[in-house]
Every structure is written in C-alpha cells, then in structure tokens.
C-alpha cells in the first residue's frame, strides 16, 4: 500500500505530468524522425495514432496546470485515459491491416479531420498521410511500428490504472 500512497503523492507533483509530456515529445519526435529523416511515408492510421499520442500530451499539459487541484488532476487523468485508449484501438486496427490484409478492410486514402480543425492543412509536414497502412516499412526486434504502439499505449493504460487506483489512498 506504500506504493499507492507514493504514486498518489507523485501524481500531485508537476514533475509527474512533465515526465508524461516528455514521453510524448520523445515519441512524436521519433515519428517525425522516421518521416523526415528516414523518409518513411506515414499512412492514415499512423497520423491518427500520432493525434492520439498528442492527446496524451494535451492531457499532460492540462495536468501540469494545477496537479494539486483534484478536478484538474482527474480531468487530466481522464483525458490521458481516453487518448491512450483511442491510440490502443487505432494501433490494434493498424496491426490488423498489416497482418490480416483484406481488400474489404482497408484504411482511408486521405486523413479526415473535422472542418473546424483541419490539421493536415494547418501542418501538412506532421499530419498529411501518403503511405500504405498495410505495408510494413520498419521493424525493430521483429515488431512493426503499430505493434510497438500497441505496447506503448497499453503501457500508458497500465500506468494510468496504477495512478488512478492510487488516488484512493492517502498521500504520504
């Protein structure tokens, strides 16, 4: 139970939210490195997964505002959970496109963002897709990029679960 009390205290500290933000910056930087340096074309699913990761970053920024305020902290945790869950669902679907190809199950040809937030028009260098979702263009330790994203987003949800449980324990 000491672990949960420590996690509760840690979640009320700006450093915890800053670490989450740095995690997102690292992975977004890696995505841009793959795209612009290694010249790997991002697909539609890659862009949606990138947006989900940015959602985790937005949650981290929100939590940074006032981590001692329970409302702000819980809203940050909820946004983190929603973004990580959406990222996991997208990554699992992307893995399915890669390893169970079907002419009936394909990703869109173009990214579709709402009219009020056309990210691919505002920042095409980051949000424009021109790759094929079913192609495996990169692997590390025999896992494709979407498989790594499944691990990353699932890891986020596991970490989030521990932190949410810790909210019900008294701080040290």
Curated annotation (Swiss-Prot):
For this UniProt record, give its keywords in alphabetical order, as a comma-separated list. Answer: Cell inner membrane, Cell membrane, Chaperone, Disulfide bond, Electron transport, Membrane, Oxidoreductase, Redox-active center, Transmembrane, Transmembrane helix, Transport
Q: Which GO terms describe its biological process?
A: protein folding
Instruction: Give the bilayer topology.
Output: Multi-pass membrane protein
User: Which Pfam families does this UniProt record tie to the protein?
Assistant: DsbB (PF02600)
Transmembrane spans: 17-33, 52-67, 75-92, 148-166
GO annotations of cellular component type: plasma membrane
- Intracellular or extracellular location(s): Cell inner membrane
GO molecular function list: electron transfer activity; protein-disulfide reductase activity
Against InterPro entries, the record matches this protein to: DiS_bond_form_DsbB/BdbC (IPR003752), Disulphide_bond_form_DsbB (IPR022920), DsbB (IPR050183), DsbB-like_sf (IPR023380)
List residues in topological domain: Cytoplasmic.
1-16, 68-74, 167-172
- Taken from the record's topology, the Periplasmic segments are 34-51, 93-147
Fetch the HAMAP family from UniProt.
Answer: DsbB (MF_00286)
Q: What does the UniProt function comment say about this protein?
A: Required for disulfide bond formation in some periplasmic proteins. Acts by oxidizing the DsbA protein.
The record's comment on protein family reads: Belongs to the DsbB family.
The protein in question is named Disulfide bond formation protein B
Which source organism does the UniProt entry give?
Vibrio vulnificus (strain CMCP6)
């Amino acid at each position: 139970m000491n672990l949960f009390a420590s996690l509760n205290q840690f979640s009320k500290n700006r450093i915890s939210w800053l670490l989450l933000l740095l995690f997102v910056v690292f992975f977004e930087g890696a995505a841009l490195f793959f795209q612009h340096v290694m010249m790997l074309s991002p697909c539609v699913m890659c862009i949606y997964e990138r947006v989900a990761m940015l959602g985790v970053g937005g949650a981290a920024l929100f939590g940074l505002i006032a981590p001692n305020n329970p409302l702000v902290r819980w809203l940050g945790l909820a946004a983190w959970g929603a973004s990580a869950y959406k990222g996991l669902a997208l990554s699992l679907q992307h893995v399915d496109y890669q390893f169970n190809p079907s002419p009936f199950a394909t990703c869109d040809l173009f990214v579709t963002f709402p009219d009020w937030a056309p990210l691919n028009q505002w920042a095409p260098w980051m949000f424009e897709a021109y790759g094929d979702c079913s192609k495996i263009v990169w692997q590390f330790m025999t896992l494709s990029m979407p498989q790594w994203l499944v691990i990353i987003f699932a890891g986020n949800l596991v970490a989030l679960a521990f932190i949410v449980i810790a909210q019900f324990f008294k701080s040290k």
